[in-house]
C-alpha cells in the first residue's frame, strides 16, 4: 500500500509540474543555449529581457536606448519620426546569416531551425513584428522570397506567399505597414541573365508574374512604395549583349508595372534603386543621373522616383550626398536605403551609418526636399559577420537611428545659424543682377552677352571660400 501511495503521489507531482509548464508563457531565449519549438504557430516572446527602446538622452550609457532620436520631438517644424520614417529591412535583419564568399553562417539565431519551411517563415514573421514593436518603428520592407519560400511551381510558391502575407497582415495591426515591398529577381538561377533584360522570353514572363504577385502583396499589406532593384539587369560583356534591345525590354516591363499598379488601385510610389555593379559587371541603372535619363527617354519620368542607397552611391564613384542632390533637383528623391560602405573595399558592405558628418549631409538633402514621405529611411544594413548576439540587432538599429537623428539636429543648427546659406547666396549673387536674371530666364542671347563682356572687360573671380564652408559645417557637428 505504501508503494501505491508513493506512486500516486509521484504521478500527482508530475501532473502539477506539466500543467505549470503548459500554462506558463513561452519565450524564445535570446541566447544560443536554447532553441524555439518547431511549430510555426508558436507565439512566445523572441526577445525576452529586451524592453521597448526609449529615448534617454545623450548622457545615457544604456546601449538599448536612444540618445539622439526622440520620435515626438519637433525639429524644423516636424516631429523627428516624420522626418525619418525609419524602416526595418526583413532580409538583413531576419535572413542575414553572416555567411560570405569565404565562410559559412555565423548567426545561429535561437528561433531558426535550419530550414526554409513555411512554418519557419511564419515564425520569422512573428519575430520580425516583435522586433519592430520593441524598436518603436512603424515600417518594414521585404522581398517576396525572403518572407516566404520558393516551391516547385509558381502556383505553389504564390500559395506560400499568400499564407505568410495573411499572417503579416494580422500581426501588423492598424499601426504598422510596409514602407515598401519588392520581388527578389536575382537569387534564383533562372535570373542569371537578368529578369526584365533576360535573353529568354520565358524568364521575362516569369519575372512579370513574380512582380505582379509582389505588387499585390505590397498593396494588400498597405505598403506605401514598391521598389525595382535590377541586380541582374545589366551585362558581363557587350560581346554577346544587345544593349538597345535589353533597355527597350526593361522599359516595356516597367510600363507594364505602371499599368498594373493603376489597375489594382495601388496608390504607392514606384521606385528604382540605382546601383552600378555587383552582381553584374555593369548595371543599367548605374547611378541617379543614368536612371533619370532612362526614365526621361522612355517617358516614365512622371511614374517613378528613386530609392538612393548610400553604399551604391560610393560604388558608382559618388558621395551619397551627390546622389541625393542629383535625385532631389530632378524631382526624383523618393526614398533612402540608409547604410554606408567601407572606403577601403570595393564592394557593397551594407554597414549601418555611424559617420555623423555623412549623416548631416544626408539630412541636408532630406530637409531641402521637405522630407521623404511617402518614402523614408530603410535600414538596408546588416550586422558584421562577427556580431552574433541577438541584442546586436537592436544596438545596430539604435546606432543608425541615433546617427541620422544627430544629422537632423546638426542641419537645424546650420539653418538656424544661417552662415552656410549666406555663404552660398553670396557666391552666386552676381546672377541676382538684371543680366543674371535674364540668363536664368532664358532671355539672354549670345549677342547680348558678348556686348556685356566687352563692356565689363576681364571679370573679377572671387574666392569660393571652401575652407570657410567646411569650417561652418564642422562647427555644427
Residue ranges of predicted features:
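Active-site acidic/histidine proton-transfer and metal-coordination neighborhood
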Residues: 40, 125-127, 139, 149-306, ...
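N-terminal small/glycine-rich loop or linker at the start of catalytic domains
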Residues: 82-115, 182-198, 230-237
Amino acid at each position: 500500500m505504501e508503494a501505491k501511495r508513493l506512486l500516486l503521489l509521484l504521478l500527482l507531482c508530475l501532473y502539477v509540474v506539466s500543467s505549470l509548464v503548459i500554462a506558463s508563457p513561452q519565450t524564445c531565449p535570446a541566447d544560443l543555449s536554447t532553441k524555439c519549438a518547431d511549430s510555426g504557430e508558436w507565439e512566445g516572446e523572441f526577445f525576452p529581457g529586451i524592453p521597448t527602446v526609449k529615448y534617454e538622452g545623450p548622457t545615457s550609457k544604456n546601449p538599448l536606448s536612444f540618445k539622439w532620436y526622440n520620435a515626438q520631438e519637433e525639429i524644423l517644424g516636424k516631429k523627428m519620426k516624420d522626418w525619418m520614417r525609419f524602416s526595418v529591412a526583413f532580409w538583413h535583419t531576419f535572413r542575414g546569416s553572416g555567411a560570405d564568399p569565404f565562410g559559412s553562417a555565423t548567426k545561429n539565431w535561437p528561433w531558426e531551425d535550419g530550414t526554409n519551411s513555411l512554418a519557419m517563415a511564419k515564425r520569422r514573421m512573428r519575430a520580425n513584428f516583435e522586433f519592430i514593436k520593441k524598436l518603436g518603428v512603424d515600417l518594414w520592407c521585404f522581398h517576396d522570397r525572403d518572407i516566404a519560400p520558393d516551391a516547385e511551381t509558381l502556383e505553389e510558391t504564390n500559395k506560400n506567399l499568400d499564407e505568410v502575407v495573411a499572417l503579416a497582415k494580422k500581426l501588423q495591426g492598424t499601426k504598422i505597414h510596409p514602407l515598401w515591398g519588392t520581388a527578389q529577381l536575382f537569387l534564383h538561377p533562372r535570373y542569371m541573365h537578368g529578369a526584365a533584360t533576360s535573353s529568354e522570353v520565358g524568364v521575362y514572363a516569369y519575372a512579370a508574374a513574380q512582380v505582379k504577385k509582389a505588387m499585390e502583396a505590397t498593396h494588400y499589406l498597405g505598403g506605401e512604395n514598391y521598389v525595382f532593384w535590377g541586380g541582374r539587369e545589366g551585362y558581363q560583356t557587350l560581346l554577346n549583349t544587345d544593349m538597345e534591345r535589353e533597355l527597350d525590354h526593361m522599359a516595356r516591363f516597367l510600363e507594364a508595372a505602371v499599368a498594373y499598379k493603376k489597375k489594382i488601385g495601388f496608390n504607392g510610389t514606384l521606385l528604382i534603386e540605382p546601383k552600378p555593379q555587383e552582381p553584374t559587371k555593369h548595371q543599367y541603372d548605374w547611378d541617379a543621373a543614368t536612371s533619370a535619363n532612362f526614365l526621361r527617354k522612355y517617358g516614365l519620368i512622371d511614374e517613378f522616383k528613386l530609392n538612393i542607397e548610400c553604399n551604391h552611391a560610393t560604388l558608382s564613384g559618388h558621395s551619397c550626398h551627390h546622389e541625393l542632390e542629383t535625385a532631389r533637383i530632378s524631382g526624383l528623391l523618393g526614398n533612402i536605403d540608409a547604410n554606408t560602405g567601407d572606403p577601403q573595399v570595393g564592394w557593397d558592405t551594407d554597414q549601418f551609418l555611424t559617420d555623423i558628418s555623412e549623416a548631416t549631409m544626408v539630412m541636408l538633402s532630406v530637409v531641402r526636399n521637405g522630407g521623404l514621405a511617402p518614402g523614408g529611411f530603410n535600414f538596408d544594413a546588416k550586422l558584421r559577420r562577427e556580431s552574433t548576439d541577438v541584442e546586436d540587432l537592436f544596438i545596430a538599429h539604435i546606432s543608425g537611428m541615433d546617427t541620422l537623428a544627430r544629422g537632423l539636429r546638426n542641419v537645424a543648427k546650420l539653418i538656424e545659424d544661417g552662415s552656410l546659406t549666406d555663404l552660398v547666396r553670396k557666391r552666386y549673387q552676381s546672377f541676382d543682377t538684371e543680366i543674371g536674371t535674364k540668363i536664368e530666364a532664358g532671355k539672354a542671347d549670345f549677342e547680348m552677352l558678348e556686348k556685356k563682356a566687352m563692356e565689363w572687360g576681364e571679370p573679377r573671380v572671387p574666392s569660393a571660400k571652401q575652407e570657410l564652408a567646411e569650417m561652418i559645417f564642422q562647427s555644427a557637428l
